Amino acid sequence: MSRFMIRAVFFRRYTAATVGKPFRNVAEVKQYLAKQTWSIDEILHGEDTGKAAKQGVPTEEEVRKLLALCAFPVEDADLQNSKRILVKQLSFINKLHETSVDDQDKNLDENYARLLPRQNKALTYDDLLKKIDGIKQDEATGEPTGSWDSTGLAKMRKDNYFIVRQGLLKNRK
């Protein structure tokens, strides 16, 4: 029995996971716990949802156009659910835009702050084409294979702008 307990203690000792730097004293723990944090519920269900609703909930026609633009099925779509999801996404984006992180960036150690680099190289048109070629459409999200070619209508390039002269103007008044 005691041999089993020793194995259990030994096993637990070497399987512990750590995240970030360890705390060195109680003051660091108190300082860490005193920092203001966000709750996802506050962000998505707080006052910002009301702001997004005041800014304008997308109409059913706008939701249909967005679904068609994304090549999702429009006929069998749950428009009310899509509207609710759009309002949540808009409120989350608004919250991110309102948050100032400039003061915090000075003290951040990038090794513990982000998984992606902060400064990224600008993409060129050729880089975008390579990335697009590698994208696989997901049938689970309703994307039919080969439904939309994002660069197929761009026939001309001038001053880093891509000119589309056909296809998109069919249903305009």
Swiss-Prot record:
Keyword Chloroplast: no
Protein name: Glutamyl-tRNA(Gln) amidotransferase subunit F, mitochondrial
Organism lineage string: Eukaryota, Fungi, Dikarya, Ascomycota, Saccharomycotina
Biological process (GO), any one: glutaminyl-tRNAGln biosynthesis via transamidation
Function text: Allows the formation of correctly charged Gln-tRNA(Gln) through the transamidation of misacylated Glu-tRNA(Gln) in the mitochondria. The reaction takes place in the presence of glutamine and ATP through an activated gamma-phospho-Glu-tRNA(Gln). Required for proper protein synthesis within the mitochondrion.
Species, as recorded: Candida glabrata (strain ATCC 2001 / BCRC 20586 / JCM 3761 / NBRC 0622 / NRRL Y-65 / CBS 138) (Yeast)
Pfam families (UniProt xref): GatF (PF20977)
Superkingdom assignment: Eukaryota
UniProt cross-references to InterPro entries, sorted A to Z: GatF
